[in-house]
Amino acid sequence: MAAVAVVGAGKSGQAAARWLALGGRRVVLWDGRDSEALRVVAGALAPFGVEAVLGREFVPEEPDLSLVVVSPGVRWDHPGLVAARARGVTVTGEVGLAWESLSHRRWLCVTGTNGKTTTTALVGHILKTAGLRAPVCGNIGRPVTDLLLEPEDYDWIVAELSSFQIESAQGIRPEVAVWTTFTPDHLNRHGTLERYAAIKAGLLMQARRAVLNGDDAYLGARRSAWPDAWWTSTQAPAAVSLAGKDICIENRPVLPVSAVRLPGAHNLQNVLMAVAACHLTGVGDAAIASGVASFIGVPHRLEAVGEYRGVRFINDSKATNYDAALVGLTAVPAPSVLIAGGQAKTGESGPWLRAIAERCASVVLIGEAAPLFEKWLRAQDYRAVYTAHTLERAVPMAFEQARAQGAQCVLFSPACASFDQFRNFEERGDRFRALIAALAS
């Protein structure tokens, strides 16, 4: 029996390995890391016949290897993948694997640098409100291959796709695709901004209908390149736009802006894109309005997690780059106390640093980026900087700063990846939430 290699033992790799093994394939799961948690994963997959290789980078050593399935966290130019392709072995991502078996379903895919999680979740919520079976999956937390393990007669598959997932699922052709925003991110993975943009654009070019955010500077400047797309804008005429106090589809009022429960101008952009996408699926105005009005947001994105002694705590762990963190800063009342830091990324930090100086009473820093961020802030003559190193120390420090300086809230918006101290932004946000619960208990 030909072997299948699954590279990466995260959620998507586990789901892919399980489904392939249940289909009678001989599966070897590879992960360059080794930990107690991964050994637990290996033990859970062993009854399905999955062999696990931990602590070694993937090499295509099986002579009868027929397929390699790649998790999103594994570089597409990983030497093992390059060697496999050179041998003529098919290499695909977990999303590409799912597409092969679910291409007969209607897919609605959302991508973008920022805003994609909220937009994806809102689309799923609206479709559910309309009575449709539309599971939400992909980069939002549930592997797409989970749908293969629980086959149902879905009306739509709503998938949030990162650039990593699109890169390794090049055959995917959604019915509707949404591009939320575009700013520099993941350049350590993709190399150039042009390559990063081309990956995002590729998804929309293969879609039957495209939705783009006209308020995004990069996308709006390329409007002529997408003449058949559905454009949205909070600032200018568009297929879905604002007129007075209403959200309109082709100048037809659908619901009042006041019905939107999400904070911040950026979330109004997300709402307009979700409205456009759901309209293109055939959902009526009443269901769209009801879905938007009943949607309260997603975990880890400007999530209110508690209040203690007059100070509100906001979990924005999903803000893993400067642009997302800037959005968070401008969405909460000033002055606030900011907790930031983690594993620093490349990108333009200037607007974020200026917003800190204008809106933050003080900043508490954690993680690897703390010395760099302190240097940047002090170079701007911003002095209210404190280093806590860990989230456990940062929370009480930030609370005391808020009380002392009359700040209304503590905002945890890292502007960094989480991998220096946590497995992902979800674990980081969950830890912040738990610390706030302990503080208030």
Swiss-Prot record:
Subcellular location: Cytoplasm
Keywords recorded for this protein, A-Z: ATP-binding, Cell cycle, Cell division, Cell shape, Cell wall biogenesis/degradation, Cytoplasm, Ligase, Nucleotide-binding, Peptidoglycan synthesis
EC number from the UniProt entry: 6.3.2.9
GO biological process, one term: peptidoglycan biosynthetic process
InterPro entries according to UniProt: Folylpolyglutamate_synth_CS, Mur-like_cat_sf, Mur_ligase_C, Mur_ligase_C_dom_sf, Mur_ligase_cen, MurD
GO cellular component: cytoplasm
Signal peptide: none
Record-listed ATP binding positions: 112-118
Family the UniProt entry places it in: Belongs to the MurCDEF family.
Main function: Cell wall formation. Catalyzes the addition of glutamate to the nucleotide precursor UDP-N-acetylmuramoyl-L-alanine (UMA).
HAMAP family linked to this entry: MurD
Protein name: UDP-N-acetylmuramoylalanine--D-glutamate ligase
Source organism per UniProt: Gloeobacter violaceus (strain ATCC 29082 / PCC 7421)
Origin organism lineage: Bacteria, Bacillati, Cyanobacteriota, Cyanophyceae, Gloeobacterales
